[in-house]
Amino acid sequence: MNCDTAQPWMMSSYHPSTTSDVFWTTTPSSTSTTPSSDNGIQQYSSISTSSGYAPANSPAKTAEVNQLGGVFVNGRPLPFEMRCKIVELSRQGTRPCDISRQLKISHGCVSKILTRFSENGTIMPGTIGGSRPRVTTPKVVEYIRSLKRSDPGIFAWEIRDRLISADICDRANLPSVSSISRILRNKNGGNSSSSSSSQLRYIRDQLAEQQQQQHLQQHQYMEYNNNELNQISGNLDYQVSSSNTPPSYDSYHFIAN
């Protein structure tokens, strides 16, 4: 077949739109060949904008479809309007599972937003990226240890309540139960310098004790040998006389041939 020959599908009256704005329809057309997932992505783009139009030059976002049929962007927080809707439905008595099915949002996302609202009173998302700031400051660690020393049978969740009642921490920087348990298990509090110095001190004490025992054993051995020699010399009754001593010479005396 000659590729240069015009085919019937090339002679159709379809012409692409030249307008700068594209309107995303919510109902798929009968002649459209776009998959259903693409329609969902287009619907999400129309919802995200204030008007019903999405600029053609807007950057493309990678959207995905969850198991409930809802569209989300991985790594991005839920829109503020959806967060408000979740809280409103929860105040009306709707269960989180029903909210999840109604809004097509995962149950974990709904539970996390409601938990954050009940604890901190906010529906705003946390920081995107980065790590959580350290909450186990030396002051908090020392207070936790003091509570454990005063009451050895106290639980970690009781320590969390004590930290809030004593104004040591608030809901934002309150350490978790696992962090408190880790602090209680680690008696040195993660202070590697103090642990290393204590180990060196213990080694020095052990070496000093060993040296002292060696000196004591040597002293006892020398005393035993001296006693044995005194007994032997007493039994022989050997007396040193002037005749038994060898002659002494001056340092400058020598014998000539």
Swiss-Prot record:
SMART domains: PAX. It is found in: Nucleus. Residues 61-187 bind DNA. GO terms for biological process: defense response to Gram-negative bacterium; regulation of transcription by RNA polymerase II. Residues 139-187 are annotated as: RED subdomain. Residues 38-52 have a biased composition (Polar residues). One of its GO terms (molecular function) is DNA-binding transcription factor activity, RNA polymerase II-specific. Residues 26-37 have a biased composition (Low complexity). PROSITE patterns: PAIRED_1, PAIRED_2. The keyword Transcription applies. Keywords: Developmental protein, DNA-binding, Nucleus, Paired box, Transcription, Transcription regulation. It comes from the Eukaryota. Residues 26-58 are annotated as: Disordered. Gene3D superfamilies: Winged helix-like DNA-binding domain superfamily/Winged helix DNA-binding domain. It holds the Pfam family PAX. Residues 64-120 are annotated as: PAI subdomain. GO terms for cellular component: nucleus. Transcription factor. May play a role in pharyngeal cell differentiation. May have a protective role in response to infection by the Gram-negative bacterium Vibrio cholerae. PANTHER family: PAIRED BOX POX-MESO PROTEIN, PAIRED BOX PROTEIN PAX-6-RELATED-RELATED. This is Paired box protein 1 homolog.
